[in-house]
Amino acid sequence: MNKIVFEYLFEAVEINSVVSLEYRHTTDNAQAILVKTKHGDSYKIAVIRYKPDSDCATTNNKVFEAHDAGLVISTKHYAAAIPWDEIAALYTEAVKN
């Protein structure tokens, strides 16, 4: 994973809040997760799965973890794994704009 790409994503999500997450229903036990940039562009980047037994404190609590395969985003009831190549594509698109 390119360190600059990761730092950009981390800054966008954790510090500047220029990227927000939106959930869209797709099936009974899964929803699409969208990344929305500050310019209003939405990118479908993963499918998240319902996890009823979560130990996150609140619904709004988001946890971001970097793994070899990609970025893992967890909320109280959902978890999504986003491949690094899709994050790099999102970063490249954002830079073009």
Say what each PLM segment does.
Residues 1-39, 88-91, 95-97:
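Short glycine-rich, low-complexity segments
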Residues 1-4, 59, 82-85:
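N-terminal functional modules and adjacent low-complexity/disordered segments of proteins
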Residues 9, 73-78:
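Residue-level signal for the start and early helices of compact helical domains
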Residues 18, 48-53, 78, 83-95:
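Structured surface patches comprising rigid loops and adjacent beta-strands/short helices at the edges
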Residues 21, 33-35, 47, 57, ...:
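Short linear proline/tyrosine/threonine-rich motifs used for host-factor recruitment
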Residues 28-30, 68, 77:
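Short beta-strand-initiation
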Residues 41-75:
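Acidic, low-complexity, intrinsically disordered interaction modules
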